[in-house]
């Protein structure tokens, strides 16, 4: 399966202390069941919830499954990506486009 690694996305997000927002859009054929199976496999392997992941939101919009996450650092995302990508490949999850990564300036919580 051809997946796009978060590592190959925008290179402007650098350094271990920069909090980032990463947004993934799955290919149109990816289902909620594939997402759920991915989470089950990560939990079984002891890889869910990964260190550094502050928020994980999964939803469907415009006919595609999407995930938005906030990470404490790019390094933590990269470490998790090494464990995540083989699971996504095995489950058959492909991305519609490269993940988008943005440096976070501010987070406001109620």
Stretch-by-stretch model annotation:
Residues 1-66, 72-86, 93-110:
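Short S/T/G/P-rich N-terminal loop/turn motif that feeds into the first structured element of a domain
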């Amino acid at each position: 399966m051809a997946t796009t690694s978060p590592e190959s996305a925008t290179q402007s997000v650098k350094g271990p202390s920069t909090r980032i927002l990463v947004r993934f859009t799955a290919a149109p054929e990816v289902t909620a069941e594939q997402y759920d199976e991915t989470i089950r496999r990560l939990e079984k392997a002891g890889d869910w919830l990964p260190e550094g992941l502050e928020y994980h939101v999964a939803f469907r919009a415009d006919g595609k499954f999407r995930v938005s996450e906030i990470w404490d650092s790019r390094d933590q995302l990269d470490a998790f990506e090494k464990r995540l990508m083989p699971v996504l490949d095995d489950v058959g999850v492909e991305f519609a486009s490269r993940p988008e990564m943005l440096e976070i300036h501010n987070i406001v919580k109620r």
